[in-house]
């Protein structure tokens, strides 16, 4: 269960500027609610999967919606939210491992971030995983490919985050800080993409590389916590949550590594947008819209996605 570990060196006392809703945050009320309702993340996940696949089936009868402006607004909102969360979590995060008497071990074993300013942004982080499911609604309505990596990632992140929040998992400060930072870049990238900006391939590679680094760090932290707890020392993370941690981060690493390989390393990769103008270079798409061409309606006036090799594409072009 959650352990309150308030340290007067952090929280409101560690911030020169704070917002009204941060000072009024009630950690006890928030934690109690999550302990009584965290399992609803599983219910929400089941409903989510049913809705998106039903929606995908229904959309087969309709043309894709043009949602560039709403998509830009949505991604911009999530980018700003993530930037604020990252900035507000950073002072306590740095203090947790760099202040006198603190260490990396302290930062992953003491949940002193669960109240005050960081407590508020931790709660918002957990709740945001529910609202981020809206990402998939845009994919379905725009008839973009819906891949396993996308919906699996959304579902498991939400369930794990809610489970970790109810226990005040100490290593969560690392996961939250990293995720806020990666999402700040990722959603900013998506916002620009929604405005049809031509962005260099390196930007997508940076986002994916940071996502992979996040997974590697998650596994390292999990192993460290396991060793500490196995030695009989105190570390605020339940065995159940630690098991979930290993499971989700290991599978994320495999999935994102597979995506990175096929999108940026392997020649004639599966994840390529084929441009109508042959003078334009083919460029990899982000993991939000990856899928073989067969899943796309042939009448959609958008760049298609193909799994064919370069040789196969040349044959088709000659036949035309």
Curated annotation (Swiss-Prot):
Q: Which residues are glycosylated?
A: 14
* Keywords annotated in UniProt: Fatty acid biosynthesis, Fatty acid metabolism, Glycoprotein, Lipid biosynthesis, Lipid metabolism, Membrane, Transferase, Transmembrane, Transmembrane helix
Reported EC number(s) for this entry are: 2.3.1.199
Q: What class of enzyme is it?
A: transferase
Q: Which GO biological process entries does UniProt record here?
A: fatty acid elongation, monounsaturated fatty acid; fatty acid elongation, polyunsaturated fatty acid; fatty acid elongation, saturated fatty acid; sphingolipid biosynthetic process; very long-chain fatty acid biosynthetic process
For this UniProt entry, what is the primary localization, expressed as one broad class? Answer: membrane
Q: In which pathway does it act?
A: Lipid metabolism; fatty acid biosynthesis
Q: Which GO terms describe its cellular component?
A: endoplasmic reticulum membrane
Q: Which Pfam families match?
A: ELO
Q: Where are the transmembrane segments?
A: 33-53, 67-87, 120-140, 145-165, 203-223, 242-262
Reading the lineage from the top rank, the first entry is: Eukaryota
Q: Which reaction does it catalyse?
A: a very-long-chain acyl-CoA + malonyl-CoA + H(+) = a very-long-chain 3-oxoacyl-CoA + CO2 + CoA
**Lipid bilayer topology:** Multi-pass membrane protein
Where located?
Answer: Membrane
Q: Check the record and name the InterPro entries matching this protein.
A: ELO_CS (IPR030457), ELO_fam (IPR002076)
Molecular function via GO? fatty acid elongase activity
Which PROSITE patterns does its entry note? ELO
Explain the purpose of this protein.
Answer: Could be implicated in synthesis of very long chain fatty acids. May be required for normally rapid growth.
State the similarity comment: Belongs to the ELO family.
Can you name this protein?
Answer: Putative fatty acid elongase 3
Organism of provenance: Caenorhabditis elegans
Annotated gene: elo-3
